[in-house]
Amino acid sequence: IPNRANLEGILYNTADGTPRYVIEAEELLRYSGDRSFLRDIYPSVVLSIDQSLRHHTDEKGYLLHADADTWMDVKRNGIPGSPRGNRANDIQYLWYKQLEAGAHLARLMDDAPHAEVWHEAAVRLARNFEADYCNKDSLLIYDHLNADGTPDLQYRPNQLYCFELIADDDFKQRVTCRVWEELVYPWGVASLAQWDLQFHPQHENWHYYHKDDAYHNGTVWLWNNGIAMQRMIEYGQQETAWKLFQNMNHQALHEGAVGSLSENADAHPREGKTWAGRSGTFLQAWSNSEQLRVWYQYFLGIRPDLMSGTVTVEPKLPAEITELQTSVKIGRGTLYYTYKDGKFDVRLEGEDAKVNLILPQAAAPNPIFQGVDFCQPRPLEHYPCFDTYHEEALTY
C-alpha cells in the first residue's frame, strides 16, 4: 500500500500500510459480517502476505523496512529524524497481526494451505520476537533491531503495541507501568523519554532547532493515547486510563478545534505554564479515532465478531460513571446499551448474533500498578538539542 499517490507518481514509504489494510479488513468483517466484501478483497490479501514472505522478511521471519518507513517517518534533507530500520517492534507486531488476520480470512475462504502457512509464520515470528526484543531486567521491549542485529535502546512508546507477541504477562504489566511513568504525560504520550540526549521538550522551538527534529523525538502524539489506555484497562486499571481519557475530552470540548483532538502536543509546558500546548495538525483523524476506539471497545467493552455470530460486551467502566445510555451500529442492527444502578442492560436488534455479556468482577488491588501515575516534566536548564542551532533551523 503506498503512502502517497498523485500525478507525479507513487511513494512507498510506509511499512505499516499494507499490514493495516489486512488487519482492518478483518476488523470490518467482524463489524459487518459482509462475506461478499471478503471475496472481493481476498486476492489482494493473498498477494500482500505472500509477497512479503517471499521478498521482505529475514531468516527469523521479521519484516524488513528502511529507516523512515514507520509512522516515525520524518526526513529533513533526506536524513531520517528518528531512524528505526530495519526491524521496528511495532512493524513486527503489525506483520504478526497481518499474518493471523490473513489466516483467519483464509479459513473463512476454505483456503487451508494459506491458513496453515500464515499461522505457522506468525507463531515463529512471536517465538523469535520474545527472545530477541525483550529485556526483562530493564523492563524494556527494544524499539527496533538495527541492520547489524544490535538492539536500539531508546525508550519509545511503540513497545506497547507488541504485547500479542509476548507470553510473559508479568513482564507486560511491568512494561505498561514503566511506559506510563516515563512517557505518558497528562496531555498525552511522548515519542521519546525526557532523559534521552535526543529529547526535545517542545515541538516548535525555532530559536534552537528545526521542528522536524523534535517531531518524533519528544513531541507528544495523541494517537498513542489509545494503546496506553487500552493496556491499562486490560489490566484492570481503568481508573488510571480514565484520567487521560478525561483530559482528552477536555481538549476536544474546550480547546482548539472544538469536537476534535490535535495531532501533537509539547512534551513540556512553556515557561510559566502548567499545561503543554497543542501542536501539529489541529484536527487529526487517528488521534480522534483512537479515543473513540478505546471508549467503545474497552471502557464499554463492545467487540463484535459477526463472522462467528457473536458480540462480546465486557464493560470496564470507571467509578465516576454511574449511569449511561448509548447505541452502536453493528452489521444491519443496533446494539442498545444501558448502565444504571450498577446493572447493565444490553440488547441487539436487527442482527442475528448472540450477545455475550461478561460482567466486571471485583478483584484485589494489583501491587504491580500501585502508585503508578502520569509522567511529570523534569525540565533541564539546558538540553543537548539546544546546541544544534544554525541558520537552517530557521528554514521551514
Language-model features, listed with the residues they occupy:
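A short small-residue
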Residues: 27, 78-82, 101-102
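Extended, well-ordered alpha-helical scaffold segments
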Residues: 35-54, 94, 98-130, 168-185, ...
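A general alpha-helix detector
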Residues: 24, 101, 158-161, 227
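Extended glycan-interaction surfaces of carbohydrate-active proteins
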Residues: 1-13, 54-87, 127-220, 253-275, ...
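Aromatic-rich carbohydrate-recognition surfaces in CAZymes
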Residues: 1-65, 72, 88-96, 119, ...
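Surface-exposed helix-capping loop/turn segments at secondary-structure junctions
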Residues: 58-61, 104-114, 133-138, 301
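Non-catalytic C-terminal accessory modules of carbohydrate-active enzymes
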Residues: 181-182, 196, 214, 227-396
